[in-house]
Amino acid sequence: MTRLATSIGSFPLRNPVICASGEPVMTEAGIRAALRAGAAGVIAKSVNEQPAAARQLDKADYAFLDAAGMATAGPAAVSLFNRSGLIQRDCADWFAAIAALDREAAREGAFVAASIVYASTDGAETVASRARRAGLRVFELNVGAPHASEAAAGAIVQETDPDRLEALVRRVRGATEGMQLWVKLTGLSSNLPALSMAAQRGGADAVGMMGRFMGLVPDLETFRPVLGTSAAYGGGWALPIVCRFLALTRRAAAGSLPLIGTNGVRSGGDVARMALCGAGAVEVLSAVMHGGFGAISRIIAELDTFLERRGLAFSDLVGDLADRLEGYGDQLETPGRWRDFVPPETLQSE
């Protein structure tokens, strides 16, 4: 299926669907399952240098929500609401394990990457060095984990300042010579184009956007929060928000910065939508948590069917919409159009 082939900069991918970091890929078995399902690559469950971030996993909890915000386990689930923590495994041991899996994956044109959820610059540099020594090819630096505001102090840090981000990425870049360095940004900032450009100046090979949002869901039966706390919230509803920032970032970088879309992909059509806005690949996780690893196979198959029907290659989509995006001032005037979207009483004569 060469029409699915893509790349993130100079790094080739057999298709644009990557399994994102999370609980499904916290074991070697889970990573292999994602690869068997056809994923172009897997971002293995994240680490950092803070024991508190790993301990947080013992307090993790999860809920799938329907469109009305009600907890559900059925097909109506459209959003994942959860709090989480990092893998409870020695960093060197974990990186050795996933490096072996990466070597296996490379024989099939796929990859397995290391990931860190940022806590400190020194820690990120040290962890990145361990990933390089383990022989891994891709390192994801996640500076946008939504849980930062709720986690124990210092366990997780969210970076939203462009100057600090540039300095951080430059340090990590120095520790990852010869590796792909992908920086994952927060969804809790309107400054994503500036943050993306800062990451690029620091030496990032690609930028992923965007992390989930923090939310609070009241349970109308108990009058208490679902899961007992605020938690990270993402779903298909987020896709238009992600698409807008992908397009704005592609424009800010004049197409020079490879982009990875994440948060909201539930179908092959969603992959195509993010591609049109500039994403050369996407990361999926919530769909896997809800539907199993078969969700990866389904999404890839749906995308391939779409491309075949349209007579296109995936690369034809990347940035096509973003490069032609217009603003409000570019639109034709349509006086009275508002009348089509109000109740009839609004238009009655007094």
Question: Language-model features: where?
Answer:
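Glycine-rich, positively charged N-terminal anion/phosphate-binding segment
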Residues: 2-7, 28-106
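Short beta-strand/loop segments at the ligand-binding rim of alpha/beta enzyme cores
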Residues: 11-18, 106-114, 174-186, 250-262
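Catalytic cores of alpha/beta
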Residues: 28-34, 122-133, 189-202, 249-255, ...
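Glycine-rich phosphate-binding active-site loops on the catalytic face of alpha/beta enzymes
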Residues: 44-50, 140-147, 206-216, 264-265, ...
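C-terminal helical cap(s) of enzyme catalytic domains, especially alpha/beta-barrels
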Residues: 51-71, 217-235, 275, 287-312
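Active-site beta->alpha loop and helix N-cap motifs at the rims of alpha/beta catalytic domains
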Residues: 68-162
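Glycine/Thr-rich beta-alpha phosphate-binding loop at enzyme active sites
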Residues: 80-88, 146-163, 195-255
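Alpha/beta catalytic cores of nucleotide-metabolism and tRNA/nucleoside-modifying enzymes
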Residues: 234-256, 268-350
